[in-house]
């Protein structure tokens, strides 16, 4: 066993060491980089395949490996990396190599004429191959960007300690991978060659050697082309030549303007100097031999050098400018700065610094500070730092912190002690100090420049104090203000504009400073400054004071004004002096604008550089300031600047994938993006294509018998003409469907129109072509096509001998108007073209389009013929259209279907149809008459013919009778002869031997059918005939036997008589007829049988379908009801068993949960719930329903046996699991004895300091009236299904009287819900820190739940749980009882547990999105958790008080609540509803008062803020005497709005958008026309101009206040004023007030003084005067105004001192000696980078406990701004994004016993 463990341990440790070693990691990463191939591999493979000779192959591989080695070295060696990364390297390497490669391939003996040996190394081709592979390996990252495999080594090298070893191992790994790769390629080439040889051997093809030779030569040219293309791949991204770019032209223009301004300034200065030359001769003579006498010469030399460098600089950047303006992909813009910050450079800079008494690596150290420190150490020996030991640093840091902390804590504790004495001295609260100049006059600085309020301003300000009224003129003060200060306060108008003044200085005091300054210059400057005249330094005259000129002051100082827009700012490039070392942010050297700015006309620039959303500027109206009636563009050039344009910006609806990209910049290589449609909103990923909705083009539905039946049934129903009661409903539904289909069709048509318009807009030069085509079509139509049609029509009329209609036709032709419109359809005029119509597009609208008519009717005839308006219900067609490029007419632009034109032949055809109808009518009358006469004639003929035929038939019958008589006589005579012959035959033997056998006749039996049919009758008739014939034959035979004599006939004769033949024929015919009849009857029978069977089958199927449908439905209903009944019976049985074995309270819990979940499920069907939202009862009830195995029982037993969790599980649950499942241990079982219950909960509650009430206070709580009142309140609250009171608790505290005890504990248990969240948090902390089985006391502070053990355990059950922003514990800390609070407890239910059943409806109605997270289901879970848990919604206490929309949205929920109140107890909550309805009305009044523009007023809250922080902006605006005069009312009122609210939305109602836009289009046309009447009336008739929208009639009311006064605008929603709540102008006071409110805690939240809360009311006007009055002040309405029921200890100290004390408490000096944790950021010098502030120390003392308890009060949880406070305090940094400078464990983890 020992040997086995030894082996295993060694193997594991050895494997871990090998895997984690630098060599293995380097080999792995180097091998992985082999797979990052580039164009260099192509040249290497080309050399191995195409080149002949081993020397060339070796040179190619050596060049390739050398290039890769250089790339690996460049990762470690920074100068080499910078050199290879510079853009000039590409131009230096590629361009000369291209030349050499071209010459080497085209000239065979180029540089090789001396060396005849082709395989020599000195041969140029071998060198060329070597350098080719080397250069391409270096240029690989430029041409084809390196993959992630190549970047792995670059990433890991920053994490490895031994960087050189890692690089060498990675290079070796790459070399191994390269060898394997080349070997594999060699094997592939050999296999391909063998395959080709085998093919050549089998197929004998004579190869053409000349073709192969040409192909081999062409390969060189192909590779040359490929090489040139790869070079251009990167070089092609460079913009055009620098001099021809638009930015260069702008820079040149700016330079010329600056030069002109400089010349003008020099001329003005020279003129002023000449005028005052005589006065200043003595002063110049005195100052001439001194320091600045020869400065100008030196300045001229430096300027010349700068000019030379400025001339040479563009020559370098002609081919490549790495700072070019289109280099970045994105452009982060900031209007406050002149240029834009570059975003691709990292802001992190690593350097060592001292922090917390240790030397650490800081990655946010200012780089300029480190460079300055190095420069000082290199140049001057005085600035070298002494190396301080680790212990000295820690000791000094610890001592300073200890001293600071002791002072602050002592001061703080002294103030608290004074508060405990219940006295009210003035000095308890530390007030904020403000800087004053004079105490008597009370002149103090403004808030912007007060260092105690806003930090140091770093400037010199004199006599600028706010309380006294300032004069209009200010004195010229000296000002050297910081650049940052000037930038930040450039837009504010709360301080005066300072002017520069000549500074008066003391020359003698300046001498030493100047000497030291020039000594510094000699140290730092490369060139000597001996040319400066130092002789005059000591030759100052004896005058103590003098004046310095402004030019000489620029030599030393760099001045800047606060206002950046001032033209008098000193040009910093021309100033020479000390460069201030500040943190220089990398900025672009260009200031770019986007397309929108160019369209809006903010900056007058010819070209924009940033692409924005595709938009076009549509000019609606161009107004000239001199002449209002002249709107044409053909004006003089002098008047063009005076024009004012009314324009709109039209945005394209195409998907915008450009996203503010700079023109000409490198595009991001976007992969895995698919565009499935021609026009789609966004790019889709192929991963989600399956989840997208796809339209199916074909539908394959299998037709079942039931479907056929229903289709047949519907078809029958349609044929029926019965009118049911549902007929009208069906008609309404059909009409509604038709309307919906019509709307959908219009939407599709609109979408199609937009797509066509966008397509025209996206194609290059499409708008130019389309515009030209439209204009040509309009000209052709107006002047060629229509006149030619008029001429031809009238000529034809003349030829047809009709009068021509020239005047009528030309009148209609002149009426047709062609109005030029914008691309959107906004009408301009006939002559005015829209601006940039060739690029932006144009539409041509035809008003009163011409219709060629064959004839014109007279007006009298037209007016006489009037139709009934009721009958004429057809809608009139629009009398306008738009022209297309094909000359067609459409109703709307880009409509797909052309308009049906009025045909010239339509009226002719109508007339012809009318005439044809008349002819038809006449013809049919004639036909009718003819038909009647022919019918009469035919009837008479029939009658006569019948008579004739009857007479003939009678005669024929008479003849037939006579013939029959004759025949009978003859027949009898014949039979006599036959008898005689028969008797003679009897004598012959033949007759005896051969007797005649007569055929027996068989009667045809009829079919036994009950129904008599035609076939049966026929059969009967045939049978009767056959019977008659048989009887005749029998009778005749009898007569023959009677003795007729027949003559003898010879028996040998073969002839028979004619009589016998006739009989046989008749016999045969009868037999044939009988057979045919029988066959026919049989066939008819089978046919009828088949037909009957078929009909029977069809009808039975139909009948079965009819019967089966209700049978199936009934069966399904019965089965479902049976299941429901069985399930309900089973549930009832299980519930009865649970009721018998468990406590009744659990049923109450579950019923409430079921009700709440049911009400919630009605709103959202598929919501996922979090486990934390469920209660214990619900979870354990679900567990109990599962058949738990023994294994799981033991697991649950382990859960319940854990001593920490038993207090969090309810006793009912424990009893249930103990009694039924047998899981819980018996000692944890709930006992009914009060003593055991008290002992059980005292172990838990002894750490809760809230249960700290006195006995007197407790006795007040036990009163019966108070108890009953709370009980009623809680019962009502439970009926409302509120989440906060859905639990019942067990008993906790025992009093002396058992009756009072039971009643009291029942009421008290309700408050246990408030403690649920805190206990749950503690359970989580305990579970997380279970491994560290150490007590909480090691951290040195008391638990927030620790209480006084001497006092009785009690709790205030009237706690109002309000949710403020101190979540240190979720239990209320108020320990006093106020009857007022109980009285208004429902009104003040603004606590953590809201009525989430009501709020959930509101949240789900206002859902954020309808996305279905198919792949990322975790996001859906979090989203649903936020929807279903309204208690995590932020409380309105933080937000602005004028957000009225939120209050208006609450009215729905209040109305719903009112319904439920009416159901339960309306008389109880009537008052509550009134109070809740008051707040929206009050907010509405407040809102309207704020929107009032005539009387701008502020809310009470803002007035309170103004009293503390000074006058408001509106008051300051009133005092301003130099107020700007506005030209019109609208401009003045808009500025008034912007002054107060910064921005407003003035928008129309959505339902009126289309109508309003149509009105605007007509207005734009009517404004330009002179004769408006005709077109206005026609547009009103057509419905384009709606009169109900035209409310604005007078110019006097066309102002914002005029709109507000009219109720019609607001009621109809035409004019809406909505404030944008994003930001406010100069609102520092408001934000400071809101920040201060976070520190405040309301009086209903906590109460520190346990003994007497009324005595602890102190004067808190400093903090509470900003708080607006709330409903909670009803509690203290009978008390004094100056006293409040709260003391917040944190507010005793000022904000700055409080912050300092927090920081010092965090930096615990006692934890310095503990060893720090090792992190991955430790470097070779072992500089610690992280420390554990809160170390585990068991030696606890009293002082430390006090300090840590103070920390709990002074350091609230969830205060991220304190991180920034530490940052600014400790390192004096101003960048708020650096939260990770000091890495400390600020919030300790809670650990319970």
Curated annotation (Swiss-Prot):
What does this protein do, in the record's words?
Involved in protein precursor import into chloroplasts. May be part of an intermediate translocation complex acting as a protein-conducting channel at the inner envelope.
The principal location of this protein is plastid
InterPro entries, alphabetically? TIC214
Q: Does the keyword Transmembrane apply?
A: yes
The entry describes its oligomerization and partners as:
Part of the Tic complex.
Keywords recorded for this protein, A-Z: Chloroplast, Membrane, Plastid, Plastid inner membrane, Protein transport, Transmembrane, Transmembrane helix, Transport
Query: What sections of the protein cross the membrane?
Result: 11-31, 64-84, 90-112, 129-149, 172-192, 222-242
Membrane topology, as annotated, equals:
Multi-pass membrane protein
What name goes with this protein? Protein TIC 214
Q: Which family does it belong to?
A: Belongs to the TIC214 family.
- Species source reads Lotus japonicus
For the region Disordered, what residue ranges are annotated?
Answer: 1504-1524
According to its UniProt record, where is this protein located? Plastid, Chloroplast inner membrane
Q: Biological process GO annotation list?
A: protein transport
């Amino acid at each position: 066993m020992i040997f086995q463990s030894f082996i295993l341990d060694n193997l594991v440790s050895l494997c871990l060491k090998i895997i984690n070693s630098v060599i293995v990691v380097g080999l792995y990463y180097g091998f992985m980089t082999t797979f990052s191939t580039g164009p260099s591999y192509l040249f290497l493979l080309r050399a191995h395949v195409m080149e002949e000779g081993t020397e060339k192959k070796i040179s190619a591989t050596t060049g390739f490996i050398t290039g890769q080695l250089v790339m690996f070295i460049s990762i470690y060696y920074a100068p080499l990396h910078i050199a290879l990364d510079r853009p000039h390297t590409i131009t230096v390497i590629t361009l000369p190599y291209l030349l050499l490669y071209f010459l080497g391939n085209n000239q065979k003996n180029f540089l090789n004429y001396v060396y005849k040996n082709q395989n020599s190394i000195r041969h140029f081709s071998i060198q060329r191959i070597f350098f080719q592979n080397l250069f391409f390996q270096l240029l690989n990252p430029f041409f084809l960007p390196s993959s992630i495999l190549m970047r792995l080594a670059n990433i890991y090298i920053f994490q490895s300690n031994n960087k050189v070893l890692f690089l060498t191992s990675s290079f070796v790994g790459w070399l191994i991978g390269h060898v394997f790769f080349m070997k594999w390629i060699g094997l592939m080439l050999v296999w391909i060659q063998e395959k080709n040889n085998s093919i050549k051997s089998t197929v004998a093809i004579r190869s053409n050697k000349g073709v192969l030779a040409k192909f081999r030569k062409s390969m060189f040219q192909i590779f040359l082309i490929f090489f040139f293309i790869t070079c251009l791949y990167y070089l092609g991204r460079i913009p055009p030549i620098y001099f021809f770019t638009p930015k260069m032209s702008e820079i040149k223009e700016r330079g010329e303007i600056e030069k002109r301004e400089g010349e003008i300034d020099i001329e003005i200065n020279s003129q002023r100097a000449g005028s005052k030359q005589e006065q200043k001769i003595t002063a110049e003579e005195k100052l001439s031999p001194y320091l600045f006498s020869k400065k100008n010469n030196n300045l001229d030399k430096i300027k010349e050098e700068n000019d030379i460098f400025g001339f040479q600089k563009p020559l370098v950047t002609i081919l490549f400018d790495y700072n070019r303006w289109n280099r970045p992909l994105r452009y982060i813009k900031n209007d406050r700065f002149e240029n834009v910050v570059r975003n691709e450079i990292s802001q992190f800079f690593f350097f060592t610094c001292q922090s917390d008494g240790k030397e650490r690596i800081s990655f946010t150290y200012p780089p300029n500070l480190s460079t300055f420190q190095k420069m000082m150490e290199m140049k001057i020996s005085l600035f070298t730092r002494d190396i301080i030991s680790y212990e000295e640093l820690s000791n000094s840091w610890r001592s300073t912190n200890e001293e600071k902390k002791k002072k602050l804590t002592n001061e703080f504790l002294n103030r608290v002690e004074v508060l405990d004495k219940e006295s009210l001295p003035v000095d308890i609260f530390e007030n904020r100090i403000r800087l004053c100049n004079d105490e008597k006059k009370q002149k103090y600085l403004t808030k912007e420049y007060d260092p105690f309020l806003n930090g140091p301003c770093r400037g010199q300000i004199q006599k600028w104090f706010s309380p006294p009224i300032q004069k209009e003129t200010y004195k010229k003060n000296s000002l050297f203000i910081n650049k940052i200060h000037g930038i930040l306060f450039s837009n504010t108008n709360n301080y005066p504009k300072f002017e520069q003044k000549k500074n008066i200085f003391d020359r003698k005091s300046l001498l030493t400073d100047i000497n030291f300054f020039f000594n510094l210059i000699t140290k730092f400057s490369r060139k000597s400054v001996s040319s400066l005249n130092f002789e005059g330094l000591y030759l100052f005259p004896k005058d103590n004071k003098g004046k310095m000129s402004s030019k000489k002051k620029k030599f030393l100082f760099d001045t800047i004004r606060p206002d950046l827009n001032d033209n008098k700012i000193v040009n910093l490039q021309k100033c020479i002096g000390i460069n201030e070392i500040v943190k220089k942010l990398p900025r672009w050297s260009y200031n770019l604008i986007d397309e929108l700015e160019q369209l809006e006309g903010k900056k007058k620039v010819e070209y924009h550089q940033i692409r924005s959303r595709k938009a076009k500027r549509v000019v609606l109206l161009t107004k000239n300031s001199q002449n209002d009636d002249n709107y044409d563009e053909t004006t003089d050039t002098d008047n063009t600047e005076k024009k004012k344009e009314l324009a709109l910006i039209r945005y394209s609806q195409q998907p915008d994938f450009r996203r503010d990209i700079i023109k000409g910049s490198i595009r991001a290589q976007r992969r895995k993006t698919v565009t499935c449609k021609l026009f789609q909103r966004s790019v889709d990923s192929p991963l989600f294509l399956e989840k997208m909705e796809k339209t199916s083009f074909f539908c394959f539905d299998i037709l079942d018998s039931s479907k056929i039946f229903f289709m047949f049934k519907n078809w029958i129903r349609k044929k029926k003409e019965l009118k049911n009661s549902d007929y009208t409903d069906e008609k309404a539904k059909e009409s509604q469907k038709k309307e919906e289909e019509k709307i959908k069709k219009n939407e599709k048509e609109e979408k199609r129109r937009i797509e066509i318009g966008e397509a025209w807009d996206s194609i290059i030069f499409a708008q130019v072509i389309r515009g030209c085509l439209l204009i040509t079509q309009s000209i052709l139509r107006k002047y060629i096509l229509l006149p030619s049609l008029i001429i031809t029509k009238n000529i034809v009329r003349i030829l047809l001998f009709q009068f021509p209609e020239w005047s009528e036709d030309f009148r209609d032709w002149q009426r047709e108007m062609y109005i030029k419109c914008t691309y959107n359809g906004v009408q301009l005029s006939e002559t005015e073209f829209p601006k940039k119509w060739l690029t932006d597009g144009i539409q041509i609208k035809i008003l009163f389009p011409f219709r060629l008519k064959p004839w014109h009717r007279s007006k009298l005839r037209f007016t006489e013929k009037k139709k009934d308006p009721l009958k004429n219900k057809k809608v009139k067609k629009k009398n306008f259209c738009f022209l297309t490029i094909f000359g067609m007419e459409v109703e709307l632009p880009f409509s797909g279907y052309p308009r049906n034109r009025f045909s010239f032949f339509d009226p002719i055809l109508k007339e012809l149809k009318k005439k044809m109808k008349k002819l038809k009518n006449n013809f049919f009358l004639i036909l009718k008459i003819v038909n009647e006469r022919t019918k009469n004639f035919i009837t008479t003929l029939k009658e006569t013919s019948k008579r004739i035929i009857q007479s003939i038939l009678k005669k024929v019958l008479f003849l037939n009778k006579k013939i029959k008589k004759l025949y009978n006589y003859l027949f009898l005579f014949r039979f006599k002869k036959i008898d005689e012959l028969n008797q003679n035959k009897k004598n012959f033997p033949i007759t005896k031997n051969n007797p005649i056998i007569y055929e027996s006749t068989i009667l045809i039996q009829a079919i036994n059918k009950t129904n008599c049919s035609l076939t049966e009758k026929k059969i009967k008739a045939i049978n009767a005939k056959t019977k008659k014939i048989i009887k005749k034959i029998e009778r005749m035979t009898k007569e023959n036997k009677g003795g007729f004599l027949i003559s003898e006939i010879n028996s040998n004769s073969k002839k028979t008589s004619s009589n016998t033949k006739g009989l046989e024929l008749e016999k045969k015919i009868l037999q044939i007829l009988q057979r045919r009849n029988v066959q026919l009857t049989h066939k008819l029978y089978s046919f009828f049988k088949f037909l009957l069977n078929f009909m029977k089958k069809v009808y039975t199927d139909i009948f079965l379908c009819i019967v089966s449908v209700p049978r199936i439905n009934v069966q399904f209903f019965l089965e479902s009801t049976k299941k429901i009944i069985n399930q309900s019976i089973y549930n009832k049985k299980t519930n009865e068993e649970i009721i018998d074995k468990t406590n009744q309270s659990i049923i109450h819990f579950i019923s409430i949960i079921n009700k709440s979940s049911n009400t919630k499920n009605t709103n959202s069907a598929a919501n996922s719930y979090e486990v934390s939202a469920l209660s214990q009862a619900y979870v354990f009830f679900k567990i109990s329903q599962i058949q738990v195995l023994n294994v799981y029982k033991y697991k649950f037993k382990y859960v319940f046996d854990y001593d920490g969790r038993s207090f969090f599980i309810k006793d009912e649950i424990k009893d249930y699991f103990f009694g039924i499942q047998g899981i819980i241990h018996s000692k944890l079982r709930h006992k009914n004895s009060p003593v055991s219950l008290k002992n059980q909960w005292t172990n838990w509650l002894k750490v809760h300091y809230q249960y700290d009430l006195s006995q007197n206070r407790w006795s007040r709580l036990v009163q019966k009236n108070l108890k009953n009142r709370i009980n009623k309140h809680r019962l009502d609250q439970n009926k409302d299904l509120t989440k906060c009171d859905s639990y019942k608790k067990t008993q906790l505290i025992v009093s002396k009287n058992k009756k009072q005890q039971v009643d009291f504990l029942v009421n008290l248990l309700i408050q246990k819900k408030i403690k649920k969240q805190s206990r749950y948090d503690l359970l989580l902390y305990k579970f997380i820190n279970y491994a560290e089985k150490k007590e909480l006391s090691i951290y040195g502070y008391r638990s927030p739940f620790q209480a006084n053990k001497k006092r009785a355990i009690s709790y205030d059950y009237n706690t109002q749980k309000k949710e403020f922003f101190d979540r240190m514990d979720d239990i209320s800390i108020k320990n006093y009882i106020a009857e007022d609070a109980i009285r208004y407890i429902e009104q003040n239910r603004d606590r953590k547990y809201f009525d989430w059943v009501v709020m959930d409806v509101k949240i789900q109605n206002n859902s954020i999105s309808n996305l279905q997270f198919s792949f990322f289901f975790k996001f859906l879970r979090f989203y649903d958790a936020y929807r279903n848990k309204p208690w995590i919604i932020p409380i309105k206490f933080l937000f602005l008080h004028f957000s009225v929309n939120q209050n208006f949205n609450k009215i729905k929920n209040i109305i719903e609540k009112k319904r439920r109140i009416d159901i339960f107890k309306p008389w109880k909550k009537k008052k509550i509803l009134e109070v809740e309805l008051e707040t929206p009305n009050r907010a509405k009044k407040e809102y309207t008062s704020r929107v009032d523009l005539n009387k701008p007023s502020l809310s009470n809250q803002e007035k309170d803020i103004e009293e503390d922080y000074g006058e408001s902006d509106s008051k300051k605006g009133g005092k301003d005497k130099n107020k700007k005069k506005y030209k019109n009312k609208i401009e003045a009122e808009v500025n008034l709005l912007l002054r107060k609210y910064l921005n407003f939305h003035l928008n129309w109602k959505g339902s009126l958008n289309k109508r309003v836009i149509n009105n605007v289009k007509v207005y734009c046309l009517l404004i330009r026309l002179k004769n408006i009447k005709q077109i206005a009336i026609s547009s009103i008739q057509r419905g384009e101009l709606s009169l109900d929208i035209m409310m604005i009639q007078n110019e006097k009311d066309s102002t914002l206040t005029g709109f507000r006064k009219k109720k019609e605008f607001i009621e109809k929603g035409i004019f809406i004023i909505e404030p944008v709540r994003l930001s406010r102008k100069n609102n520092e006071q408001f934000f400071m007030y809101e920040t201060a409110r976070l520190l405040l805690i309301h009086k209903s939240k906590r109460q520190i003084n346990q003994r007497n809360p009324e005595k602890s009311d102190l004067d808190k006007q400093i903090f509470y005067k900003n708080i607006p009055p709330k409903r909670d002040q009803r509690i203290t309405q009978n008390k004094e105004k100056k006293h409040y029921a709260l003391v917040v200890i944190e507010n005793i100290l000022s904000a700055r001192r409080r912050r300092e004390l927090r920081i010092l408490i965090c930096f615990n000096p006692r934890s310095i000696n503990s060893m720090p944790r090792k992190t991955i950021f430790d470097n070779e010098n072992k500089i610690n980078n992280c420390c554990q502030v809160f170390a585990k120390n068991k030696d606890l003392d009293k002082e430390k406990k006090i300090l840590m308890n103070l920390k709990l009060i002074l350091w609230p949880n969830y205060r991220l701004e304190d991180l920034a406070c530490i940052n600014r305090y400790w390192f004096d940094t101003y960048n708020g994004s650096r939260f990770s400078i000091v890495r400390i464990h600020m919030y300790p983890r809670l650990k319970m016993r």
